[in-house]
Amino acid sequence: MKSLYLIFGLWILLACFQSGEGVRGPRRQHNPRRQQDPSTLPHYLGLQPDPNGGQIGVTITIPLNLQPPRVLVNLPGFITGPPLVVQGTTEYQYQWQLTAPDPTPLSNPPTQLHSTEQANTKTDAKISNTTATTQNSTDIFEGGGK
């Protein structure tokens, strides 16, 4: 049974290796004396030939189009404001402000916070301090109930 697993595992490894080789293109021969044409260099770096010296000058431009959020969340005590304001392609400005809770009192303060009811504190109820001598031994309350 182990030999079957070994054969199956080798078959899978061989299949994966061959599938990876099929996707790969032909290997290039590196020639350090041959200068690469600037038009074939990667365009995302913005590589441009220098007209004065024949060397390549590098200008990196990353276009960012960020819009400020439509809804600003104003939580007291936290930083609020648009997250990032981009001007041009190289200048960044971040505008923020720190807000604290408003110390002014409420315009309509509540007159009474909560209505509370006191418990019945009548002392006319007679409560026995002794326990009954019956088998279940429960307290006996005399009178005073509603």
From Swiss-Prot:
SMR1 mRNA is about 1000 times more abundant in the submandibular gland of male than female. One of its GO terms (molecular function) is hormone activity. Induction: By androgens; strongly. Expressed predominantly in the acinar cells of the submandibular gland and to lesser extent in the prostate. Pfam families: PROL5-SMR. It is found in: Secreted. The lineage of its organism: Eukaryota, Metazoa, Chordata, Craniata, Vertebrata. InterPro entries: SMR-like (IPR026288). Sialorphin may be involved in the modulation of mineral balance between at least four systems: kidney, bone, tooth and circulation. GO terms for cellular component: extracellular region. Residues 23-43, 99-146 are annotated as: Disordered. Glycans are attached at N129, N136. It comes from the Eukaryota. Residues 1-22 form the signal peptide. The gene is Vcsa1. Residues 109-139 have a biased composition (Polar residues). GO terms for biological process: cellular response to lipopolysaccharide; negative regulation of peptidase activity; regulation of sensory perception of pain. The keyword Signal applies. This is SMR1 protein. The keyword DNA damage does not apply. It comes from Rattus norvegicus (Rat). Keywords: Cleavage on pair of basic residues, Glycoprotein, Hormone, Secreted, Signal. Several O-linked glycosylation sites might be present in the C-terminal part.
